Amino acid sequence: MKKMYFIIIYVLLLSIGAINSANKSITKLEAYNIVISGIDSTTLDSTEIFVSKQILPANTVIEIGDKSIESPDYGSWMFFINKYPLSNWGHSCNYMLIGSNNGEVDIIESNFYPTKPSLADMDKIKSSVVTFDESVFVKPMARPQLLQTKATYDSNKYAVIISGGGNPSVNYPRYWNDCSSIYQTLLYTYNYDSAHITVIMSDGTSSNIDRSTGDSSPLDLDGNGTNDIQFAATSNNIKTTFSNLASRLTSNDYLFIFTIDHGNYDSSGNSSLTLWNDENLYASTFAPWVNAINAKAINIVMGQCFSGGFISYFKNNPKVSISTASTKDQPSSSMSDGRYDEFVYYWTEAVTKKASSGYMVGDVNQDAFTTAHEAYDYARTHDKKNEDPQHYSSDLLSHFLALNGMRARTTSGTIAVERGETFNYSGMETINWTIPLNSPVNISIKFPTNIVYKWNCSSGNPG
């Protein structure tokens, strides 16, 4: 995918016949018929189309996030064509400008919705036939008996959940569902303290309409009657949240960060997370706030478009594990029923759903710790959308880090080994074995098999 905000402009001269000969203005409906005549019939049903309420004056500036385009030097109807309504923004889309008198058509390819005039300033002239229940409320899950032995106390676990939404026209209810699901997972499956979970969503605690369904996001994410959404999704609120955590967390604490909704990138390819009022929070700004937090480990899961572009900003932080729904230049998508986003749904399922064995479905080695790498791998293999999930952590961190802390070590330090003795070891530190000289050592590695091991043998007297 080329990193261009809009790729090419096509100019088509159409004959409007009697309309032009009579020098009559083209009506909105006539302009719409021109638009749909140029859309492939196989994709028309799933396409949604918006049109400006009035004819745009010549040379009107149309803002598209941080970029802009300009209408022709004559009056025109502006149409916005979204062929992929189940994908998050940004993704491939078209702007069509139909000359109100001459019938000339300008087609501009882009990857983001208009922010001025916004979709709220336009009329949806055609809806997609893709239907789903946008208003599904995720019911509270029954609190299960915890399987794992906690590696840390609940007071050492913190989380930040962020869903920017963009604006009411593109703040789809599935983002609320995604956040509600992970919030309940943290609270009821992993025993996080609600006071340690910061929820930053759309317009925060405002009662104004903030969703595409024409309602206000419920503030209660788990149905217990208590408001859980605390702050509006602005860069200032996010910066303040991470600043507070940087002054509070210590090397004994764990931080989980979850982001969802839309994403974008600038002309330099710098990925961003779309916040409320279409504000862009770029990876180059976001990462230093997170990297300033001195936690034992930070587990990041991102579901927005172009989320893979955040990874490079964390590669110098050995305490960070990050999983993303897509690469730095790919959109991300919802599930086919539109109620959740594909990647984050399966990531959450990996750490929440129990298999017949009694362990979580993502817990491959059944050690009661569904690690960040196991959850990512489960989500990646179950993700059937046109997206390529990404993952990174240094020093094997994600093979040990889980929502319930760090996978427990069975032993560490110096170990005296007698002839024929065996032991199990799980950990990341260097260990020392003391054995009699000329004794054979048989090493059997059962799990995991995809890790690099280093061995060093030397002789000496016990100290």
Where are these regions (language model features)?
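Boundary/activation segment at the start of structured domains
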Residues: 137-252
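A short, glycine/acidic-enriched catalytic loop
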Residues: 216, 221-223, 233, 248-250, ...
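Active-site-proximal C-terminal subdomain of hydrolase catalytic domains
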Residues: 180, 298-393
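Short, compositionally biased P/S/T/A/G/V-rich stretches that sit at domain boundaries
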Residues: 405-429
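Acidic, glycine-anchored loop motifs typical of Ca2+
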Residues: 175, 211-229, 271, 360-372, ...
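Exposed beta-strand-loop-beta-strand "reactive/processing" segments of non-cytosolic proteins
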Residues: 47-97
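Aromatic/hydrophobic beta-strand junction motif of beta-rich domains
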Residues: 186, 425-435
